[in-house]
């Protein structure tokens, strides 16, 4: 299974996944895919945006560190993470606290 780090570093995670892998791991991959596909649009990622003249760039190294701790994150409430993102929660921590209780 490809990891979030592989995706951010350029590995084509979507094309390379087999249907059986998606069925087996999709629940864990889906939140990360959602985060990556919407990262530029969501206000909760404003802390991860490095402003450059004329463009916005996401600080992917910092995002990887925060989303990929040493142990895997188990997303328990995928619908909640989607709702919080679409409602533009202020901080990524708010979303992760709801979705990934420790």
Curated annotation (Swiss-Prot):
Tree of life domain: Eukaryota
Q: InterPro entries from the xrefs?
A: Y'_ATP-dependent_helicase
Protein's name according to its UniProt entry: Uncharacterized protein YFL065C
Source species of the chain: Saccharomyces cerevisiae (strain ATCC 204508 / S288c) (Baker's yeast)
């Amino acid at each position: 299974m490809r990891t979030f780090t592989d995706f951010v570093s350029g590995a084509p995670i979507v094309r390379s996944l087999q249907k059986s892998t998606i069925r087996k791991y999709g629940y864990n991959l889906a939140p990360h895919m959602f985060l990556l596909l919407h990262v530029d649009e969501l206000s909760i990622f404003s802390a991860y945006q490095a402003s450059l003249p004329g463009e916005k760039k996401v600080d992917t190294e910092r995002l990887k560190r925060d989303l990929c701790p040493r142990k895997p994150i188990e997303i328990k409430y995928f619908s909640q993470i989607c709702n919080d993102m679409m409602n533009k929660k202020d901080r990524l921590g708010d979303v992760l606290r709801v979705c990934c209780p420790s």
